[in-house]
Each structure stands twice: as C-alpha cells, then as structure tokens.
Amino acid sequence: FMRSDRIIIGTDNAETESHLRNLYRPFNRNNDRLIAMDIRSAELTKYAANAFLATKISFMNEMSQLAERLNADIEQIRIGVGSDPRIGYHFINPGCGYGGSCFPKDVLALEATAKTVHYTPQLLNAVHKVNDEQKRLLFTKIRQYFNDHLKGKIIALWGLSFKPNTDDMREAPSQVLIESALTAGMKIQAYDPVAMSEANRIYQNRVGFSCHENPEAALINADMLVIVTEWNIFFNPDFNLIKQRLKEPVIFDGRNLYDPSHLKQLGFKYYAIGRGETFNQ
C-alpha cells in the first residue's frame, strides 16, 4: 500500500478524484504513480494486469513442455528470452504452475465476464488450461519414473505454499501433488518454513500426510525428494545428506533450482521442468 508501483483511481466524479488524490499524496509525493480513469476501465485494468502476468507464466510453461521434448534447456531459453529489453525477466520462470488468491481467480473471472458480453476469450481459456496441466506435471513424472508402482512410496516434499514468503496454500501446486499422491496410496513427509500449520489444518484427517520440523527430517526413508516452492532455504542444500537419507538419489524439481550437470556428477537422477531428457542419460 505504501510503496505501490502505481495507484489507479476509478471514478466518474471529479470531487471524488480530488479527495483520493489528497488521500494518497503522502505515498505519491512525486505525483508520478497515480492514474485516474473511469470506473469500468479501472476494474478491467486490475483483472487484465493479473491475467497478463499469468499469461507470461503459462507461455513459458508451454515452452518448457516443448523444450523438454526437443532436449533443450528452458532455463537457457529463459535467459535468452529475458535478455530482450522488450520482454525482461519478470514472471517468465517456468515451473509447476501458479497459484494463490489472485491469478487463478482473476483469469477465470475475466473469462466469465467476457462470456457475459457474448465473447469467448480463447487465450484466457488456454492460460488456465496450461496451468492446470502444469500443476499435474510433477506427479506425472513421478508416476512415469516408478512405472505406476506408487503404493507405499514416500515423498519428501519441500514447499507447501504457492510461493515463497507466505503461508498461503490457496490453489497451490502442492495441493494437486498431495491429493494425487495420497489417492495413489503414497505418503507425504512435508516441510515448509511457514505453511505447515495451514497444511496440517487442510490435511489433519488424511492418512499418510505429515509435516516435519526441518527439511532434513522430511528426507528420512523417503523414496524421492520433490520441490514445489522456491524458498531460499532450498537453494543450497547438503546434497550428500540428501543422498544419505533418501532410499534412492532422485529429485523432482518443480522450480528448477539446481544445475542438472552438477547433480549428475553427484550421482542423482534429476527431473526438472523443461530441461531435456538428455540430462538423465
């Protein structure tokens, strides 16, 4: 609120606009971040901005699917694409899908609004379909790796919230993975720096789900490590300890945190997003 990138006022009344400008003046002393427009345009601006960011994410996730099938590395592609000043690096990180209280809701709301005026928004429909598929991707990779022999397998799950620095699990990719795994008879040993209370509330009556006091504890006797949220604590782990505690040195990385070549040298099987099957041969 106090450090907004921009302040958009939707009003059709000049007096109201003046009052709002005065209200926000302490937070906009240079008078360069406040934009006034009609109410309908302001409402649409909010939804359009979130839908556009969601579109960028889904576009890169679709490119990651193509990169994986062509044995290319989406992370190198991301750097190349983001270096174009017309595009930039914001919101082009491939991964296991977006979640939260804004992007999924706003994309669907904008699509529904379009239909009320007899317009079918094909791009918006594709954005959330790509995201839904991306959320299922980690479980698909796990299922393929174990040839559908999943019952009794234990997942060490790092990350529960839909993004770092929040305990919000609304529409989180972790929930899609957890539901699929528990339904298949697997067990989840989870760790998240702040979202475990929320996870325990959601899964308090679910057999097979447990939270652990630190990332290392979640690894004990697990068949694999799965990373869903890119918390800083996960970026530089003790790979030797991971290897010791897992039954098998295999990592499914939904956020592309690690260098595939380095993990291969350490003896891991590493399955990330859009990084090409050649890394595991």
Language model regions located:
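Structural/interface elements that position substrates and couple domains in central-metabolism enzymes
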Residues: 1-281
